[in-house]
């Protein structure tokens, strides 16, 4: 009976860790999307340097663009809760770089956690399989 209880505990623990791993994987995917968005914004901000007074194309979605003349290098930046502020191109570049570094750190940290979880599961799985054979549980 002791082996059976140990097996049940191991299976429960492995299942919980697998769910945690799936959650972390989803978080990493979301952060990778944020990272891609930040990179796209960085490229756009760099692209307007010294472009005041020039014609440019602005994406409006679904592969559509409008042609416009850039009147300023200032950028309207969302700061949360439907609030936006005007920042210089330089300030925006710094903010985006800081945001990018924070997201990269988070991705690194979550990837490390995921790796530890996967290693732990890989370490415990053979013992769980052995106990399954010994107790006759499928």
Curated annotation (Swiss-Prot):
Q: Name one Pfam family in it.
A: Prefoldin
Give the highest taxon in the source lineage: Archaea
The record's Gene Ontology cellular component field reads: cytoplasm; prefoldin complex
Is the RNA-binding keyword given for this protein?
no
Can you say where in the cell this protein is located?
A: Cytoplasm
Q: Which GO terms describe its molecular function?
A: unfolded protein binding
Please provide the Gene Ontology terms (biological process) for this protein: protein folding
Q: Which residues form the signal peptide?
A: none
Which keywords are on file for this protein? Answer: Chaperone, Cytoplasm
Function of the protein = Molecular chaperone capable of stabilizing a range of proteins. Seems to fulfill an ATP-independent, HSP70-like function in archaeal de novo protein folding.
Q: Which family does it belong to?
A: Belongs to the prefoldin subunit alpha family.
Subunit: Heterohexamer of two alpha and four beta subunits.
Q: What is this protein called?
A: Prefoldin subunit alpha
User: Could you tell me the gene encoding this protein?
Assistant: pfdA
């Amino acid at each position: 009976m002791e082996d059976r209880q140990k097996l049940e505990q191991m299976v429960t623990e492995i299942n919980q860790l697998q769910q945690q791993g799936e959650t972390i994987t989803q978080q990493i995917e979301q952060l990778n999307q944020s990272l891609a968005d930040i990179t796209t914004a960085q490229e756009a901000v760099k692209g307007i340097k010294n472009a005041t007074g020039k014609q440019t194309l602005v994406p409006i979605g679904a592969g559509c663009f409008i042609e416009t003349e850039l009147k300023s290098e200032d950028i309207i930046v969302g700061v949360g809760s439907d609030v936006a502020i005007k920042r210089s191109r330089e300030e925006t570049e710094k903010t985006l770089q800081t945001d990018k570094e924070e997201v990269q750190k988070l991705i690194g940290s979550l990837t490390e956690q995921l790796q530890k979880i996967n290693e732990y599961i890989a370490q415990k799985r053979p013992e769980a399989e052995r106990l399954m054979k010994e107790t006759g549980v499928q």
